Amino acid sequence: MAAHDSGRLSVSLILMQGSAEAQATLDVLEQEDPTLVIDDHGTFWKITSPTGHIEVDMERVSEELGVEISLSQWLVIMSSYIGRVHTEPGKFTLTSDVTELHRV
């Protein structure tokens, strides 16, 4: 399977705690993907997908937050990641699959 070509399947997203935007993101991700493993490190959350795919939809985060948030605004609270990134105007995708990025 192509997702395993790199030898890495899981991907992780690091979100700094303390903002409504981060909490809204966490809430949306928990609702949309129950397979995610969320570790609370006190000042940040490490969100890991054992399936190799995390997608953050800014429209969903905006709905949860109650105000519109753009990808560029959201990137300020996203501290780091482990995996490959693809962005669209309203979406942040983290994947372990190189070929997925080439299909977009």
Task: Report each predicted region and the residues it spans.
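Short, intrinsically disordered, mixed-charge
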Residues: 27-35, 63
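A short, surface-exposed helix-loop junction/capping segment
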Residues: 2-10
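Helix-rich interaction surfaces within compact, conserved domain-sized segments
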Residues: 41-44, 50-104
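Short, surface-exposed ligand-recognition loops at beta-strand->loop->(often short) alpha-helix junctions
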Residues: 13-21
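Generic alpha-helical secondary structure signal
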Residues: 20-23, 72
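Intrinsically disordered, low-complexity boundary segments flanking structured domains
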Residues: 1-3, 33-34, 78-82
